[in-house]
Amino acid sequence: MMKPEFFCFSGFCVYFLFLQVVVSSEKLRVTTPTRHLLARVGGQAELSCQVIPPHSVMHMEVRWFRSGHSQPVYLYRGGHKMSEEAAPEYANRTEFVKEAIGEGKVSLRIHNINILDDGPYQCSFNGSGFIDAAIMNLNVTAVGLETEIHVQAPDADGVMVECNSGGWFPRPQMEWRDSKGATLPHSLKSYSQDEARFFYMKMTLLLTNMSHGSIICCIFNPVTGEEKQTSIILANELFNRDRIWMESLASIVWIMLSVYILYIICFYWRTGCASGCLSKCFCVVTSWPVQIVHLLFCTGTFFAIYLPHRSRVSLSDPQFPLYNNWITELLFVILFLTICFALPIILLFIQFQFTSLTKWEKNKDGIMDQPRLGKAHETSSLYRKKTGKSWEQEK
């Protein structure tokens, strides 16, 4: 018969071993060296996790998966890769690194990173009554390849500069800066995404003068802090748009007035009209060529007053460039067509007036010469009569 002391000792040993296993199991946990990983599009990322304290996980199930996905990214079970259960979008892009699996360290290497790989991942261990997982976040970044600055045609409000850049992820930050590094307020900012989730950015700036020097378009990635800059220097002539078309308008008005004055001078010079001939002056002023000149002058004056003070659309309106361009271009078209139509008619009318005045002067001279011819004819008749009488007397 066994002694009671032996049973007590055996029970104590079993309890001690059970407690050791429980304590050891409770101490095991899964961790990761870093919870945030950065990877570039087209590059690779290594998702590492380990069991601490070090413990072999060779016969455990190791799984990487993403929340919201029914299939795992990678599954290791029974010492083999379970390819048929993995998500198809990761096929031929994953590599299981298990050199330190005996120490509880494993890694999943993902090749050819794309934007769809961005997001959180979980690494879990399951086996021998132990199950635990660790979460890590993979941040995929992409830096745009090209940044372009386009300058739109100047209008009455200034010069619109546009900065375009694509191929960014995540959405970058954009801002305009001057040559001193000061931030300039943008007029409009917008973005879009393509099917691959790349961001395409667009930002505009309205410049009314050249006091800013060179203009710099800055784009930087908020995750990596990488920045790209593209600068442009605008010629001063672009900011003289208002002065140019105002000078053109003034030149047109002066041409019309010169034609008007020339027409009046030529009319008075041809007719010999004195300065007090109000009736003839009124006829000249009310003639239709002069009325056309008046119409052009009033139209040009109206646009010269209206354009600088007209109510304008908001700078954030997508149709802002269209609105400010068409009204100025319409002015030039109207003036051009009016000049091309009216100036030849005025010149032809002046030529017609000169021809009419010349004929009128010739007719006037002919009428004045008729009495002289009559007197000469009478004189010659009397002379012949006197000559005939004297000849008869002599005979």
UniProtKB/Swiss-Prot annotation:
PROSITE patterns: IG_LIKE. CDD domains: IgV_MOG_like. The keyword Transmembrane applies. Its main location: membrane. Pfam families: C2-set_3, V-set. Residues 371-395 are annotated as: Disordered. Residues 142-233 form the Ig-like C1-type domain. Residues 26-248, 309-329 are extracellular. SMART domains: IG (SM00409), IGv (SM00406). Glycans are attached at N92, N139. It is found in: Membrane. The chain crosses the membrane at residues 249-269, 288-308, 330-350. Expressed in skin, thymus, testis and, to a lower extent, bladder. Disulfide bonds join C49-C123, C163-C217. InterPro entries: BTN3A2-like_Ig-C, Ig-like_dom, Ig-like_dom_sf, Ig-like_fold, Ig_sub, Ig_V-set, IgSF_BTN/MOG. Residues 270-287, 351-395 are cytoplasmic. Residues 26-141 form the Ig-like V-type domain. One of its GO terms (cellular component) is membrane. Residues 1-25 form the signal peptide. May act by engaging a cell surface molecule on immature T-cells in the embryonic thymus. Encoded by one of the 11 copies of Skint genes clustered in the D1 region of the chromosome 4. Belongs to the SKINT family. This is Selection and upkeep of intraepithelial T-cells protein 7.
